[in-house]
Amino acid sequence: MALQTPMMKQYLEIKAQYKDAFLFFRLGDFYELFLDDAVKAAQELEITLTGRGKGEERIPMCGVPYHSADHYISRLLEKGYKIAICEQVEDPKNAKGVVKREVIKLITPGTIMDGKLIVEKENNFLCAVTRFEDQSYGIARADLTTGESRVSLVSEQDDLFHELASSSIKEVVLSPGWTEEDAHRLRQSLSVTLSEEEAEDLPKGYESLCENVEQPKLLRAFGRLLQYLLRTQKRSLEHLQPVQYDPPNEVMKIDLHSRRNLELVETLREKKKKGSLLWAVDETVTAMGGRLLKQWVERPLLSKKEIERRQGLVQSFLDHYFEREELRDELRHVYDLERLVGKVAYGNVNARELVQLRKSLQRIPAIFALVEKIGNQDVNERLQTIDRCESLVDLLEHSLVDDPPVSIKEGGMIRDGFHKELDTYRDASRNGKSWIAELEQKEREATGIKSLKIGYNKVFGYYIEVTKANIHLLEEGRYERKQTLTNAERYVTPELKEKEALILNAEESIVQLEYDLFLQVREQVKDYIRPLQALAQMISELDVIQGFATVSETHHYVRPALQEDRAIAIKGGRHPVVERVIPNGEYVANDVDMKDGRSILLITGPNMAGKSTYMRQLALIAIMGQIGCFVPADEARLPIFDQVFTRIGAADDLASGQSTFMVEMLETKYALQKATQNSLILLDEIGRGTSTYDGMALAQAIIEYIHDEIRAKTLFSTHYHELTALEKELSDVKNVHVSAVEEQGTVVFLHKVVDGQADRSYGIYVAELAGLPNVVTERAETLLAELEGEKEIVASEKEVASTNEPTQLSLFEPEPLEAYKPKGNKQPLSDEEKTVLHDLQSVDVLNTTPLEAIRLLNQWQQKLR
């Protein structure tokens, strides 16, 4: 049977150890996959599925060339798969029986080291999560490509999900005992690959990495991470930096849904960077600066001192335009130091990459000189503590040529004069080749054959080639025939064979010695890992700061003043993304005034008028302020927010089977549970996913709860105009609206937010813009006129006497049918028809998904039957 062959037995034994990975099994010049791996890989990679054996014993198989395997591996990694690379670890010539094979590494989405397989300006974090007996969670994360490692602790599962969303997590390693339901939720919410690791003891030799960590829980979490890395990578992790502890109250908390709603690092629909806040503020010119910027955007600060330190740096760079522009030019020539250092430690850096390291380090003196000219005392003091690695530059300048090949096994890497023995071999090789050229001329003169030439191939070595017409001119007995061609003969002489041996031996010695010397140089570079990492961190921060200064100058941002009180005062605020994507000069700036008595702004106004943009604008300005960037406004005074919560837009959670309304309620619940008076809450159209009266009741109850219990700064947009009466009942509620005017039957949206309530929603007009049939919109106009002319839903006349509680709006009982009188011969509207019309008028067309629209239509249809 095919499965019983020695080779297949070997395959099955190795595959049993890597059941959750594709096993790339090296056979000659190919990586082969067998059985289920082959069937699945052929489908995913769109390659031919063949077989081994015949009939029922035929084993499915497919393969990829080893020299182009990276392309196929990257495609599988993008889909979240793991790949075990199994190589031949002995020379087939020396093998007794089946060639010995071993898995030399396990490549997973969180352990990629090849720069071609990862995004340049994104981290590639592997995360280990340990669930403890008290249901708290320890989180350890590391980027194998840069060496960065961090740990944190959260108290419950919802917080775990939101914490993981704050980093570029590609793979999560779980402790044993997770339910399939919880694991599925994690996989679906974050689109990550899941793995498992039982061991959690800190491996010996790595204790020094944890000097900043004291909590046993965090040591267990980091131990699990290291155990997984050592098991999968099968090599030392000496480039991992000392682990940093992230205390729970040092960064602004932004939950997973809010990150997506605000489009912090990617757009909601297309999942692209362009159109996100990160895109709007990214003026970095190095890969490592881009990664640090993304981390800052994902984790805004709470420390006023640190925020103002960053602001001071931005101001210094803003005040020195020419030095900043020169600095940008210098930084453009700096390669990715962090990932180059990672490859040095990992042992897979090549000569060309070490030259990139050298060229980067050669730029450091000019970079530091420009920064010193800018004159910020804080950064200049830090520059004095940075090792510029000048001795490393000297080593790399003397050892490596300027343009070495990518391969480290072909020679051509080491500079002349670096090693005496190598120079000796090179002299022999070069002089030997000169001797060959001289011999060719000498043979031509001796034989009189002008076309005689000396050539070389790998089969016969050096040879003398003579055309058949000139063979008679050769001296008999001196030339030994080696090969016959159609029109020529090839010969060797004793003299030529002797010189050939000398030349070829020298060239083989050169290649081997260069390889050995390169490994020695690479090993010496490892001694500089820590100073190189510190240097890379400094360069990264300088790049982010100059980027903030550049974007602030280009787009006229201002330095926000941080308030000790909770007041918000923004003059001429703008949405940093929207103002960039609309035609120049068309963006309408808006003020935000949220002092005492205005902690909750109740926003009404037409669809398409810009309510959602206004709400997001405030959140993004707050986040920009707390990462240290200047903000898009004429003037800004801001408090420091501990958390931001948003519920904006509507989209069914199809993966979990949850409706829009359920998702809306879950997100609102999380905000109401977690928010403090120092938080910012944005709620858009809460309650629209249920019936009118249920929705209004919920909306009012939520506003009252925020007002009385949380007291957080809140923007609450609604189409329930009845809620505007709350301004008279709740001391911190203020009505504002987005204005619009009608001109000759056309509605003009002014996009300006002003005090007071809106008089109309213009839902039917927006329906016309959306292209609904005229017969539908005309009928809606008629019905709306009847409703407005007959009777409106009003607040109950009943008031609660002798109490300080605010009056409740009576939203639950419709007026009796008799109150509505028909016009002409038309039948009076039923309660259901009134409810449907009210709902139709309230629909936000632009932010309603096709699925939600179908659901609403079905709901209205059921009511009207």
Curated annotation (Swiss-Prot):
Family matches, as CDD domains: ABC_MutS1
Database matches in SUPFAM superfamilies: DNA repair protein MutS, domain I, DNA repair protein MutS, domain II, DNA repair protein MutS, domain III, P-loop containing nucleoside triphosphate hydrolases
Q: What transmembrane ranges does the database entry give?
A: none
Which amino acid positions bind ATP, per UniProt?
Answer: 605-612
* Molecular function GO labels: ATP binding; ATP-dependent DNA damage sensor activity; damaged DNA binding; mismatched DNA binding
Report keywords, A-Z.
Answer: ATP-binding, DNA damage, DNA repair, DNA-binding, Nucleotide-binding
* Xref: Pfam families: MutS_I (PF01624), MutS_II (PF05188), MutS_III (PF05192), MutS_IV (PF05190), MutS_V (PF00488)
What the protein does comes down to: This protein is involved in the repair of mismatches in DNA. It is possible that it carries out the mismatch recognition step. This protein has a weak ATPase activity.
Family label: Belongs to the DNA mismatch repair MutS family.
Q: What is the name of this protein? A: DNA mismatch repair protein MutS
Q: What species is given as this protein's source?
A: Halalkalibacterium halodurans (strain ATCC BAA-125 / DSM 18197 / FERM 7344 / JCM 9153 / C-125)
Designated gene of the protein: mutS
